[in-house]
C-alpha cells in the first residue's frame, strides 16, 4: 500500500515520546507491506471508520489506526489505494473530537 504522510502527522510523531515514535515507525513498515483487505483485517492496527468525520482538505472519510495502546493515527484513503496519515493523537480519546 502506498503511504502519504501529512506534515501534522510527522510533526506529532517527532514531538512524541520515544515509545510512540518507535511504534509509529513500526506501523509505517507494517502498512507498506499490507494491501487494503489486509489492513481491514489486521487485529493489531484496529483500522476503523470514524463515522461522521471527514478530512477537510479532501472531503474524504476519516479512519483511525492504533499506534500504541493509547495512541491513534487518523488517516483517509485516496484512490490507488493510498493511505494518507493526517494526524497522530497520543491520547486516543482526543482523536475522536470534532
Where are these regions (language model features)?
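Terminal low-complexity, poorly structured segments
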Residues: 24-30, 46, 81-84
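Enriched for short, Lys/Arg-rich terminal
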Residues: 11, 22, 60-98
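Residue-level signal for secondary-structure boundary elements
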Residues: 21, 36-40, 91
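A general secondary-structure junction signal
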Residues: 7, 43-45, 69
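Arg/Lys-rich, positively charged N-terminal/basic patches that mediate binding to nucleic acids
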Residues: 1-35
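Amphipathic alpha-helical interaction segments
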Residues: 17-18, 48, 97
Amino acid at each position: 500500500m502506498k503511504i502519504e504522510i501529512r506534515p501534522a502527522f510527522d510533526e506529532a510523531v517527532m514531538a512524541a515520546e520515544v515509545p510512540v515514535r518507535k511504534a509509529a515507525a513500526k506501523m509505517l513498515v507494517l502498512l507498506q507491506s499490507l494491501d487494503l483487505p489486509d489492513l481491514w483485517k489486521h487485529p493489531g492496527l484496529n483500522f476503523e471508520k470514524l463515522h461522521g468525520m471527514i478530512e477537510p482538505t479532501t472531503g474524504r472519510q476519516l479512519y483511525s489506526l492504533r499506534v500504541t495502546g493509547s495512541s491513534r493515527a487518523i488517516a483517509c484513503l485516496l484512490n490507488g489505494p493510498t493511505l494518507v496519515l493526517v494526524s497522530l493523537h497520543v491520547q486516543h480519546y482526543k482523536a475522536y473530537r470534532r
